[in-house]
Amino acid sequence: NSRIQSIDLLRGLVMIIMALDHVRDYFHADSFLFDPLDLGKTNGAIYFTRWIMHFCAPVFMFLAGTSAAFMARRKTKKELAWFLFTRGIWLIFLELVVVNFGWNFDVLFTNIYFVTIWALGVSMIVLALLIFLPIPLVLVIGFAIIGAHNLFDNFHVQGNTLPAFGWALLHDQAFFDWKGHNVLVGYPLLPWIGIIALG
């Protein structure tokens, strides 16, 4: 067995916490009316189940990078790059087709969400390129992205345009209306690429 049990256990724990948050969303209808982290409106249980979620996506993304580093010990760079690329494409497909359908069971895909699984997929594709660089350089790139991406927080591309959508994919959470489809970019790529690179 080539799997590393501690990584699988941590992934499993993160998945349980994510499931807890999604269950909270379905059974606590008011969570759609106010921020569960608003101390003036929440309670301890609601606050905690939302707060702990902030660790899930970063841990999952970091572990994806860590797993790739362990795979590099038994695969050639070309094999690993192909694995990361194809896995990334598969995750993007799952997010945009299967998961998006599962949210609303809408065959017209009126609502399209670019969220966690999509960001993981694209980050894996970028990592497929980064693995060809020296490891210290990948580390520097990861730290630079994480440390500097907030410098762009005050830069926004306005409107319902392709440039605005492109910038949202990179850095800005945003909603778009595209030919009768509501598009949400919930997980911009830049910070996640930094985290997977550090992993």
Spans of model-derived segments:
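Alpha-helical transmembrane segments and their immediate juxtamembrane cytosolic regions
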Residues: 1-199
